[in-house]
């Protein structure tokens, strides 16, 4: 899986997407430190211990570099950035029962926007699995010779 590069100056808007999610009571928000003990086990369920370890690192940052998709008290998705390396997006996952609603795209755009607000101009998606998704969602480009990457 190649790493991918995203130009943060050309991110699409997400207002229509987040408005549609709100109608289903799904909110995209930055995690807060009090979420820690509730969120890490859920990330382990969704993606495994390695992802939970990366999310753990996100909670040590101010602001926390982790966004959540929630429906009520239930965490249905997450997206991290600056977890394993500076300027890297990921890991990210959405509960299989909630896929196809645009949650992953909304989390991606929200996290990349936060990176832009923190001064980054480009972001790297490390070991990008769904290359086509990242290309269409945010115009990400595969980085030549990026395999094997940091992961």
Q: Where are the language model's segments positioned?
A:
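Acyl-donor-binding surface of acyltransferase catalytic domains
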Residues: 1-23, 127, 148-150
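A short beta-loop-alpha structural element at the N-terminal edge
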Residues: 27-39
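Conserved active-site alpha-helix within GNAT-family acetyltransferase domains
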Residues: 1, 105, 117, 128-151
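A conserved beta-strand-loop-helix scaffold within acyl/acetyltransferase catalytic domains
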Residues: 44-96
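Conserved acetyl-CoA-binding loop-helix of GNAT-fold acetyltransferases
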Residues: 94, 100-113, 117, 136
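Conserved hydrophobic beta-strand within the GNAT/NAT acetyltransferase core sheet
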Residues: 89, 123-127
């Amino acid at each position: 899986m190649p790493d991918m590069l995203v130009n943060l100056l050309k991110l699409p808007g997400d207002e229509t997407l987040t408005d549609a999610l709100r109608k289903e009571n799904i909110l995209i928000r930055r995690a807060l430190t009090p979420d820690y003990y509730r969120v890490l086990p859920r990330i382990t369920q969704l993606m495994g211990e390695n992802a939970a370890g990366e999310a753990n690192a996100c909670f040590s940052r101010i602001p926390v570099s982790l966004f959540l998709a929630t429906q009520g008290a239930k965490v249905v998705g997450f997206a991290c950035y600056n977890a394993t390396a500076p300027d890297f997006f990921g890991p990210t996952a959405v509960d299989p029962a909630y896929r196809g609603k645009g949650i992953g795209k909304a989390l991606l755009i929200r996290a990349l926007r936060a990176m832009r607000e923190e001064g980054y101009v480009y972001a790297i998606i490390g070991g990008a699995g769904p290359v086509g998704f990242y290309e269409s969602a945010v115009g990400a480009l595969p980085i030549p010779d990026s395999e094997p990457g940091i992961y």
